[in-house]
């Protein structure tokens, strides 16, 4: 494989480059350095995770392929761009960076220097390709001896999302050219503080790693990523940037776990498999994470009637209630937090069956996207090991199926706090499982709760496929989560908690119904969940129905992991 040495690109000879129900109503209860960047797939032979190791027969006899965990060595270096050697150099450029003088030459010093080394070829080629630095633009240029990728950052590059996109574009260019060694630089770092440079480097690393990941476990044939190393140029060196890139490594590992859990079909990832994955996380980080898995009988003892009613029909795949607890052995006071994830490993809709092309029943494997994010965050925090928090990770895992034992429309179920719910629609099941999960979380003595759920289609009508909706009566908590999301490059928008809508959720025979009659479905869903949270506990609900899945890429995104981890670390 050829190496790219910018200072000799034009002079070097041409060389070829190598081109991832029980209704428990009767149970009333009382109210230059570098380091390796390992990415271990869910099915990795080395990791022996349950999704790969599942022993029993599965529908269709499908079993994931084995794959080795790829490693990317990441280094933050002060090497000048024109002196760097490797296969592919990716440069992030804003529209201002692409400004030219009266002779059509670059005004930007770095691009000017690079163009000079290439005898004007960079300027000519970028003009020919109409590259102007607009967001979403990218052009891959091949020169004698190597490749340069120009990536547009828009009018300015001030957000983690911009740098994620730069890293992803670099990863895509590396994949298409089968590059092994790549570098990423910014055309200009003017106006970036030292802290901003560190955060930018971390975001670029995140983009490259997640952009390089391909979930090929269920393909009969697949190509492995050739990428071996990433150099981040011009953003500084030293222990602070090293720590930040290492942080990105741990978060990416959690995101990839989340993606793999959601991508895996329901005949592979069952409630039992989610429980085993939780056990694996606890085993890996046994000094800071403990695990408690409750089966149906134990949940019945706790009077979790809402959760068990949803699970009743899936007799072949019984429910498992997952509780992980992260706590370091330090004596300092710890803020008690809970992360609660909706864990429907498949949602048929029950007797209110999802029908028609618009129902997207074939994608209901992703109805455990909230649970996947919670488990991904647990994995990441097991590595990061924050000392001032105690975090409870809670998932009420089950399937929503149809059988003679199943929950019926019109049934009345009783949650573990004694509140009764008339089930007017079995396809509004996630909130029933979350009701008992939220009660359980409050019983752990936590101060704050975030729940994540693919709860409603209504949130996608309001915000589209890329933005999560945040619901909370607490302004302070809302600000915390919004700030964490912005720092992580994940999109969410605070939505109103319109209390007057609760009137439409009242039942004539029970305390409430589980689905509102019409518009404002995302709001009424959040108001329903609020009934099961203690008033003294700060609580925020994230409706992530849109961003957990990318229709464009036909893949899970791992949404929520980054925001959850960042929020925990800020407490």
Swiss-Prot record:
Tissue: Expressed during floral development. Expressed in healthy and senescent leaves, cotyledons (emergence from seed coats), pistils, sepals, petals, stamens, and floral buds (at protein level).
GO cellular component terms, semicolon-separated: chloroplast
Active-site residues, record numbering mapped to chain: 354, 431
Residues binding Mg(2+) 1: 342, 347, 367, 429
Gene3D superfamilies for the chain: Leucine Aminopeptidase, subunit E, domain 1 (3.40.220.10), Zn peptidases (3.40.630.10)
Catalytic activity, EC: 3.4.11.1, 3.4.11.5
Keyword set, alphabetical order: Aminopeptidase, Chaperone, Chloroplast, Hydrolase, Magnesium, Metal-binding, Plastid, Protease, Stress response, Transit peptide
Molecular-function GO term, any one: metalloaminopeptidase activity
Reaction(s) catalysed (UniProt annotation): Release of an N-terminal amino acid, Xaa-|-Yaa-, in which Xaa is preferably Leu, but may be other amino acids including Pro although not Arg or Lys, and Yaa may be Pro. Amino acid amides and methyl esters are also readily hydrolyzed, but rates on arylamides are exceedingly low; Release of N-terminal proline from a peptide
Gene Ontology process terms (BP): cellular response to heat; flower development; protein hexamerization; proteolysis; response to abscisic acid; response to bacterium; response to insect; response to jasmonic acid
Cofactor note: Binds 2 Mg(2+) ions per subunit.
Required cofactor names: Mg(2+)
Pfam family, one: Peptidase_M17
Annotated residues for binding of Mg(2+) 2: 347, 427, 429
Presence of the UniProt keyword Iron in the record: no
Quaternary data: Homohexamer (dimer of homotrimers).
Task of the protein: Catalyzes the removal of unsubstituted N-terminal amino acids from various peptides. When associated as homohexamer, catalyzes the proteolyzes of Xaa-Leu dipeptides. Possesses leucine aminopeptidase activity against the model substrate leucine-amido methyl coumarin. Presumably involved in the processing and regular turnover of intracellular proteins. Regulates wound signaling and has a role in insect defense.
NCBIfam families reported in the protein's UniProt record: PRK00913.2-3 (NF002076)
Family: Belongs to the peptidase M17 family.
Protein known as: Leucine aminopeptidase A2, chloroplastic
Species of origin: Solanum lycopersicum
Lineage: Eukaryota, Viridiplantae, Streptophyta, Embryophyta, Tracheophyta
Name of the gene this protein is made from: LAPA2
């Amino acid at each position: 494989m050829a190496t790219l040495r910018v200072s000799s690109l034009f002079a070097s000879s041409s060389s070829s480059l190598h081109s991832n129900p029980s209704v428990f109503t009767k149970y009333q209860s009382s109210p230059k350095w570098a380091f390796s960047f390992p990415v271990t797939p869910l099915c990795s032979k080395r990791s022996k995770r349950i999704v790969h190791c599942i022993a029993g027969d599965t529908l269709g006899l499908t079993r994931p392929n084995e794959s080795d965990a790829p490693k990317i060595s990441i280094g933050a270096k002060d090497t000048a761009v024109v002196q760097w050697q490797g296969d592919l150099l990716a440069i992030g450029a804003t529209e201002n960076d692409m400004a030219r003088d009266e002779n059509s030459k670059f005004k930007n010093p770095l691009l000017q220097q690079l163009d000079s080394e290439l005898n004007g070829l960079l300027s000519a080629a970028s003009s020919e390709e109409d590259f102007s630095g607009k967001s979403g633009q990218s052009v891959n240029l091949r020169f004698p001896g190597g490749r340069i990728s120009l990536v547009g950052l828009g009018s300015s590059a001030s957000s983690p999302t911009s740098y994620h996109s730069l890293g992803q574009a670099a990863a895509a260019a590396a994949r298409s050219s089968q590059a092994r060694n790549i570098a990423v630089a910014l055309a200009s770092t003017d106006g970036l503080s030292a802290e901003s440079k560190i955060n930018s480097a971390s975001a670029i690393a995140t983009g490259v790693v997640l952009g390089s990941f391909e979930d090929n476990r269920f393909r009969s044939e697949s190509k492995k990523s050739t990428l071996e190393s990433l150099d981040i140029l011009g953003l500084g060196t030293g222990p602070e940037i090293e720590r930040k890139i290492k942080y990105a490594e741990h978060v990416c590992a959690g995101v990839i776990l989340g993606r793999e859990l959601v991508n895996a079909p329901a005949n592979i990832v069952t409630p039992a498999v989610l429980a085993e994955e939780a056990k694996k996380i606890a085993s890996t980080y046994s000094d800071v994470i403990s695990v408690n898995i409750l089966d149906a009988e134990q949940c019945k003892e706790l009077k979790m009637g809402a959760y068990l009613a949803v699970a009743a029909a899936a007799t072949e795949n019984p429910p498992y209630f997952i509780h992980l607890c992260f706590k370091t052995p330090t004596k300092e006071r710890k803020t008690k937090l809970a992360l609660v994830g909706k864990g429907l490993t498949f949602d048929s809709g029950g007797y209110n069956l999802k029908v028609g092309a618009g129902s997207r029943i074939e994608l209901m494997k992703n109805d455990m996207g909230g649970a996947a994010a919670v488990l991904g965050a647990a994995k990441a925090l097991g590595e990061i090991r924050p000392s001032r928090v105690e975090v409870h990770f809670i998932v009420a895992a089950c399937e929503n199926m149809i059988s003679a034992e199943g929950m019926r429309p019109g049934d009345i179920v009783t949650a573990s706090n004694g509140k009764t719910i008339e089930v007017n629609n079995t396809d509004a099941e996630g909130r029933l499982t979350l009701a008992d999960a939220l009660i359980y979380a409050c019983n752990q003595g936590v101060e704050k709760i975030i729940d994540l759920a693919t709860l409603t289609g209504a949130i996608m009508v309001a915000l589209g496929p890329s933005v999560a909706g945040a619901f909370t009566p607490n302004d302070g908590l809302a600000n915390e989560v919004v700030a964490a999301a912005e720092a992580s490059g994940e999109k969410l928008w605070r939505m109103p908690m319109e209390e007057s809508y609760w009137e439409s959720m009242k039942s004539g025979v029970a305390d409430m119904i589980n689905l509102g009659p019409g518009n404002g479905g995302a709001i009424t869903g959040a108001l329903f969940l609020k009934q099961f949270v203690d008033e003294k506990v700060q609580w925020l609900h994230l409706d992530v129905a849109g961003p957990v899945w990318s229709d464009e890429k036909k893949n899970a995104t791992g949404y929520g992991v980054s925001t959850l981890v960042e929020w925990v670390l800020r407490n």
